[in-house]
Amino acid sequence: MDELQKLEYLSLVSKICTELDNHLGINDKDLAEFIIDLENKNRTYDTFRKALLDNGAEFPDSLVQNLQRIINLMRPSRPGGASQEKTVGDKKEDKKSQLLKMFPGLALPNDTYSKKEESDDDEKVKAKPEKHSETHKKTDMSDVDAAMMELEALAPGEGATLVRPHKEVSSRDRHKRRSRDRDTKRRSRSREDRHSDRRRSRSRDKERRRRSRSRDNRRRSRSREDRDRDRDRRHKSSSSRDHHERRRRSRSRSTERRDRRDRSRDCSEKMPPPSAAMTDDPEAGKIYSGKIANIVPFGCFVQLFGLRKRWEGLVHISQLRAEGRVTDVTEVVTRNQTVKVKVMSITGQKVSLSMKEVDQDSGKDLNPLSHAPEDDESLRDRNPDGPFSSSTSMLNLQGNGMEGDEHESRKRVTRISSPERWEIKQMISSGVLDRSEMPDFDEETGLLPKDEDDEADIEIEIVEEEPPFLSGHGRALHDLSPVRIVKNPDGSLAQAAMMQSALSKERREQKMLQREQEIEAMPTSLNKNWIDPLPEDESRSLAANMRGMAAAPPEVPEWKKHVIGGKKSSFGKKTDLTLVEQRQSLPIYKLRDDLIKAVTDNQILIVIGETGSGKTTQITQYLGECGFTARGKIGCTQPRRVAAMSVAKRVAEEYGCRLGQEVGYTIRFEDCTSPETIIKYMTDGMLLRECLMEAELKSYSVIMLDEAHERTIHTDVLFGLLKTAVQKRPELKLIVTSATLDAVKFSQYFFKAPIFTIPGRTFPVEVLYTKEPETDYLDASLITVMQIHLREPPGDILLFLTGQEEIDTACEILYERMKSLGPDVPELIILPVYSALPSEMQTRIFDPAPAGSRKVVIATNIAETSLTIDGIFYVVDPGFVKQKVYNSKTGMDSLVVTPISQAAAKQRAGRAGRTGPGKTYRLYTERAYRDEMLPTPVPEIQRTNLATTVLQLKTMGINDLLHFDFMDAPPVESLVMALEQLHSLSALDDEGLLTRLGRRMAEFPLEPNLSKMLIMSVALQCSDEILTIVSMLSVQNVFYRPKDKQALADQKKAKFNQAEGDHLTLLAVYNSWKNNKFSNAWCYENFVQIRTLKRSQDVRKQLLGIMDRHKLDVVSAGKNSVRIQKAICSGFFRNAAKKDPQEGYRTLVDSQVVYIHPSSALFNRQPEWVIYHELVQTTKEYMREVTTIDPKWLVEFAPSFFRFSDPTKLSKFKKNQRLEPLYNKYEEPNAWRISRVRRRRN
């Protein structure tokens, strides 16, 4: 064995040790080598597992599969084998075939039908005619299928079986109905649900067997009664003189039997037909008829009918009626009254009954989910801790358990006495108590939040079994890190990024400390000064001033006033040229005819041109002028919303039409187009959604993928879809534009398409590097800007930073430093650029600087390619960018500061050479550029969460993800994680195929968990509130905190706080704005962003339109907040966290320590269980938008992901906890230890 093989073998041993440690807590090198030796001798799974069992290793099946997979994957290659050198194509095929064996769930056969053939609301299901006979037969029944699908959607759940009162259903009718149901279900079977139908057919077989057994039992019972009657007749006809007493006893017994039969026959006319044979004992969860035998102050005793033995049970006074509180039992029932009861529990001879869970008229079970009887096989097929399966959850939730929600929402408050209520009212009116501190206090009933300490300690753990289609490769796969986005994690650039994160954290902590000091200095109760008849001097005027501050619009910081120029600011023209002259001055104008000829001659064209050459605005107009719009629209995609809107506005001006007529745009939650639109700009995500409806995009004649070099996740998916579309539609033209020089890769991917180059206006650029690495790149960049301003010739400066927080900090520091230099220094105009800026501030970056002054534009990487700013001669490049990276630990995307690529560095340097010869100051060494930067940026599809992308591909019928034609394929681990996440959301079934719920989730332009939450709210009857919450979550920064009024803004925000959490706080804000007639003055008074609320209103309208199109009911939950919390839990159950005894909370998925954000409504309450919307890394890992939950809901809505822990074993959560001993707070924490005590004595 050579050195390389030894290293490979050691790596394999280390990996096996890690797996054993993760699963069993054993880290033994000898054991790992023994397992590898066993696998080498037993290559098949069965023999390998048997060998492990023979040696006493009772490992779980998932661990055995994982061990064998790792050994086969990492086994050292043997020299001298038959393997020869292979070509690159053969290696790729071998790799794909190897992945196909490892991950069969990623290579399911694609569906051949088109998405357009299905209507949005599932009313018409028309199969595409094909040559296959099976599909041809299905087309004849399409109308019947559509009708039966509607009936299935309207059908009640399994537990809600309707019963005809006072009438027995004949067995013939039952047989006919069952036959019709079976025929209906057989006809409505769809292609993708074929496997799940097999399971349903098995369950129907079990149901038929159970019913047949029930009929046999009834027949045996009737035959037994007939024999009893014959025996009675024989006893009656006997005339023996010696047995008069026995005959008399026999007659009395037969009379009693007849009486019992008559009574049971009378009772059976009132009861629903029995589903099983008569039993001796009652069964929990079943409904029985009975008679009130006795009434006591705390309830009533009911004698049960339909049992061989005499049984009586107690109906407690709380179980008599669901509506309102019962104080007197006789108000509800009377003695000898016939009622219907449900058996809740049986303890020995004591039976607990309930009347409120049974409809007294029809005998219907109002809460079938509790004590739902199931046969053994169905229990074995699903998670035993889940109260219902995911396939029937939507139907079972509809109309069931709502009374329990109302009861649960009622029991979370407690009533207080009248004197206490009076005291609290007086303290609130006097200003001693703030009304916002007691949001649940009711002045009439005196309700206060009830402490939840008395609840039972429930332990929840994650279900370790993977979905069947990911067996051995799901949750057991721990190395789920995406493609590495940093070339050298130990290099100077990575160290500088970490240092900057620490410095920004320190700045945030200082701001938080300053805010706390301002809050402490704020007067606590301003109302006192108004109520007090003899206030102190000037105290009432202080209160008036503080109140008046809220009504005024927010003040702008000093540096921002300087940026926008206050009231004196003027936004003049950048040029005196007309629109026609401006178009003719662009570099692309000279190549107009050549470009049109190239588009006409080629179906696919790659266009390369510098930023500002006119690609985005002119190519679409040229094609429209040449008649390409006669065959369809011209579509142009943009990676950003702001770019799509601004470009469409500019093109509409040049085209000479109103925006939304011939030229329009479509972005998420906003459609500014009309039937006359022929040139349409849109985000790449919107075009991808159009592909969901029509894969071939027949309404378009030309598709232009602009800014393709940015390689967003939507652009990469569109590459594969449009590559297929142009093969099916020869008349469709595809143009791919890029501002960088990676055109060869695009050309090779798109069938070696020709490249059309637009020469730019470039000048030489001098590149300067630092001699030593910079630790604080923010401070170094500001010093560089000041040096350029004070020493270099005239010319504007462009500084690249990573995000809004950094840019605002840089603007503030730079403004203060320039101010400290005095008035003799030439003016430096500071202009920030990021998407959250108001439009008037964004416009100023294009204005030329006044004579004698210089402007510095501080921007994110949007200025690399998307923006063209004239007059830039100097570029300062710290070498960093903020990228979205998928964190496999948290299962979420997070923004991380990383070094840029070499291609991005070249692009930034090119910004200095557009107007004249320029300079680029790179704040890193030349060695770092060469050794620590990747050649090109990592595509977004290789570093982000793919759940939404996989759901969209599945909706388009693309199940074979392994062979989908990606330009750069995403990591297999990311695809597996996305499939596992979709399966836990019930969007995929156990075989990896799309469910009906998943298909409906894909119709909403939301993340999968938000879509699931919105759809489940319909079943939970709270869709009106969830619609508002989702729209508020889709926007950001609802509240604002002016620097000089932070304490007052916090007070205003506190009055909206809800005891349930932040989601309901957002709902309260929107509803309050709505009740105030959407007033702008109300927003200013309460420190709420008016633009954010209006945006949320637009989002809500679009989502409401989608729900109306799908005929989803919009129902309000009223005051029942439990339903809203359940709906939130159904979508975000992965983001559950439990309070940790030591500090903060621990997430259930990865036991990460997190904290409630100080701005949360629950910050001071600290509930036991919470659900969060997202994690934010500032000074700590903070949870944003937090809501309290009941841990039982996690198992209820995610039975495939969570289950109750075994009470006889120590849960994983408690294993990770650390016992902290009590100690004297005045001494050091370890002073209680024996060693410390001895040392102190000595």
From Swiss-Prot:
<keyword id="KW-0378">Hydrolase</keyword>
<dbReference type="GO" id="GO:0016887">
    <property type="term" value="F:ATP hydrolysis activity"/>
</dbReference>
<dbReference type="Pfam" id="PF07717">
    <property type="entry name" value="OB_NTP_bind"/>
</dbReference>
<dbReference type="InterPro" id="IPR014001">
    <property type="entry name" value="Helicase_ATP-bd"/>
</dbReference>
<keyword id="KW-0547">Nucleotide-binding</keyword>
<comment type="similarity">
    <text>Belongs to the DEAD box helicase family. DEAH subfamily. DDX8/PRP22 sub-subfamily.</text>
</comment>
<dbReference type="GO" id="GO:0003723">
    <property type="term" value="F:RNA binding"/>
</dbReference>
<dbReference type="InterPro" id="IPR007502">
    <property type="entry name" value="Helicase-assoc_dom"/>
</dbReference>
<dbReference type="InterPro" id="IPR048333">
    <property type="entry name" value="HA2_WH"/>
</dbReference>
<dbReference type="InterPro" id="IPR049588">
    <property type="entry name" value="DHX8_GH2-like"/>
</dbReference>
<dbReference type="GO" id="GO:0071013">
    <property type="term" value="C:catalytic step 2 spliceosome"/>
</dbReference>
<keyword id="KW-0747">Spliceosome</keyword>
<dbReference type="InterPro" id="IPR003029">
    <property type="entry name" value="S1_domain"/>
</dbReference>
<comment type="function">
    <text>Involved in pre-mRNA splicing as component of the spliceosome. Facilitates nuclear export of spliced mRNA by releasing the RNA from the spliceosome. Before and after egg-chamber formation, required for nurse-cell chromatin dispersal (NCCD) probably by playing a role in spliceosome localization to chromatin/interchromatin spaces.</text>
</comment>
<dbReference type="GO" id="GO:0007419">
    <property type="term" value="P:ventral cord development"/>
</dbReference>
<dbReference type="Pfam" id="PF00575">
    <property type="entry name" value="S1"/>
</dbReference>
<dbReference type="GO" id="GO:0071011">
    <property type="term" value="C:precatalytic spliceosome"/>
</dbReference>
<feature type="binding site">
    <location>
        <begin position="609"/>
        <end position="616"/>
    </location>
    <ligand>
        <name>ATP</name>
    </ligand>
</feature>
<feature type="domain" description="Helicase C-terminal">
    <location>
        <begin position="777"/>
        <end position="957"/>
    </location>
</feature>
<dbReference type="GO" id="GO:0005634">
    <property type="term" value="C:nucleus"/>
</dbReference>
<dbReference type="InterPro" id="IPR011709">
    <property type="entry name" value="DEAD-box_helicase_OB_fold"/>
</dbReference>
<dbReference type="InterPro" id="IPR001650">
    <property type="entry name" value="Helicase_C-like"/>
</dbReference>
<dbReference type="GO" id="GO:0030261">
    <property type="term" value="P:chromosome condensation"/>
</dbReference>
<dbReference type="GO" id="GO:0005681">
    <property type="term" value="C:spliceosomal complex"/>
</dbReference>
<dbReference type="Pfam" id="PF04408">
    <property type="entry name" value="HA2_N"/>
</dbReference>
<keyword id="KW-0508">mRNA splicing</keyword>
<dbReference type="GO" id="GO:0000381">
    <property type="term" value="P:regulation of alternative mRNA splicing, via spliceosome"/>
</dbReference>
<feature type="compositionally biased region" description="Basic and acidic residues">
    <location>
        <begin position="253"/>
        <end position="269"/>
    </location>
</feature>
<dbReference type="InterPro" id="IPR027417">
    <property type="entry name" value="P-loop_NTPase"/>
</dbReference>
<feature type="compositionally biased region" description="Basic and acidic residues">
    <location>
        <begin position="180"/>
        <end position="196"/>
    </location>
</feature>
<dbReference type="GO" id="GO:0003724">
    <property type="term" value="F:RNA helicase activity"/>
</dbReference>
<dbReference type="GO" id="GO:0048477">
    <property type="term" value="P:oogenesis"/>
</dbReference>
<feature type="compositionally biased region" description="Polar residues">
    <location>
        <begin position="388"/>
        <end position="399"/>
    </location>
</feature>
<dbReference type="InterPro" id="IPR012340">
    <property type="entry name" value="NA-bd_OB-fold"/>
</dbReference>
<feature type="region of interest" description="Disordered">
    <location>
        <begin position="354"/>
        <end position="449"/>
    </location>
</feature>
<feature type="region of interest" description="Disordered">
    <location>
        <begin position="75"/>
        <end position="283"/>
    </location>
</feature>
<feature type="compositionally biased region" description="Basic and acidic residues">
    <location>
        <begin position="113"/>
        <end position="141"/>
    </location>
</feature>
<feature type="compositionally biased region" description="Basic residues">
    <location>
        <begin position="197"/>
        <end position="222"/>
    </location>
</feature>
<dbReference type="GO" id="GO:0000398">
    <property type="term" value="P:mRNA splicing, via spliceosome"/>
</dbReference>
<feature type="domain" description="S1 motif">
    <location>
        <begin position="285"/>
        <end position="356"/>
    </location>
</feature>
<keyword id="KW-0067">ATP-binding</keyword>
<dbReference type="InterPro" id="IPR049621">
    <property type="entry name" value="S1_DHX8_helicase"/>
</dbReference>
